């Protein structure tokens, strides 16, 4: 358990493990999936990677893996947001906190993907009608398994009104390979951590939502994670 998390943190621990490399300048990459990148790093042979991306990622003409994803800002009755601490399975020194969520499957809506991902990653059940939003959108470039990836994300807000006990029975092999733990953290704890947090403005986003959503989607644009 990291020393930087306060006593209020409720955690579900896990194995340990890896981090990313510098490849793309985010300023050179447009915001949506029709990205035109001339500096993408070559793909690494699958057998050289300790972790491989799943089939939900498609390789575009730029050579960069791309997908659309639904993420959830799940907040409990103590105003703590559920976050996941992970690492890159090929670079174990870098750790970061991020939100629950994942790729949108073919034929699936963002709402359906959000509900499914919450259950698979945490064991918690939410209904589509519990989702507020999307409240935030962003595109993120990050390195994983020695590849530069581009993910377009929609974030939903959910207030949890029942027991927030966490289970990891639904984790995939990839998730068990790079996720260290899950935790309910306050925005104060997120600001205090020495690990990176994504999105970078996550504490401010959650605080604003707790004060009441004004119905305006917060468009973050492109970030380099």
Language-model segment annotations:
Residues 80-121, 125:
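Conserved Nudix-box catalytic region and its N-terminal flanking loop in Nudix hydrolases
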Residues 74, 85, 157-159, 183-189:
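Short, well-ordered beta-strand micro-motif
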Residues 2-4, 41-77:
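Acidic, metal-coordinating catalytic segment for phosphate/diphosphate chemistry
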Residues 138-169, 205:
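Active-site-adjacent beta-strand/loop module that shapes the phosphate/pyrophosphate-binding cleft
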Residues 125-135:
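A short coil-to-beta-strand element that immediately follows conserved catalytic motifs
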Residues 3, 8-9, 16-40:
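Asp/Glu-rich intrinsically disordered low-complexity tracts
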Residues 2-10, 14, 163-225:
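Nudix hydrolase/Nudix homology domain
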Residues 53-62, 142-146, 170-172:
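Short, P/G- and charge-enriched loop/turn segments at secondary-structure junctions
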């Amino acid at each position: 358990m990291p020393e930087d998390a306060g006593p209020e943190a409720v955690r579900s621990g896990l194995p340990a493990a890896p981090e990313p490399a510098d490849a793309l300048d985010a300023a050179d990459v447009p915001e949506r999936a029709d990205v035109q990148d001339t500096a993408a790093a070559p793909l690494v042979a699958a057998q050289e990677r300790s972790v491989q991306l799943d089939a939900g990622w498609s390789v575009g003409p730029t050579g960069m893996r791309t997908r659309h994803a639904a993420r959830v800002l799940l907040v409990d009755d103590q105003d703590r947001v559920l976050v996941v601490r992970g690492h890159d399975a090929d670079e174990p020194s870098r750790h970061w906190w991020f939100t629950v969520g994942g790729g949108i499957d073919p034929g699936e809506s963002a709402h359906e993907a959000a509900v499914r991902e919450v259950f698979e990653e945490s064991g918690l059940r939410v209904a589509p009608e519990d989702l507020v939003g999307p409240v935030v959108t962003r595109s993120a470039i990050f390195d994983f398994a020695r590849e530069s990836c581009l993910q377009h994300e929609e974030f939903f807000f959910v207030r949890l009104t029942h027991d927030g006990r966490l289970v990891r029975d639904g984790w995939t092999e990839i998730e068990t390979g790079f996720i260290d733990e899950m935790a309910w953290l306050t925005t104060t704890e997120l600001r205090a951590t020495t690990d990176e947090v994504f999105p970078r403005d996550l504490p401010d986003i959650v605080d604003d939502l707790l004060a009441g959503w004004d119905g305006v989607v917060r468009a973050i644009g492109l970030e380099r994670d």
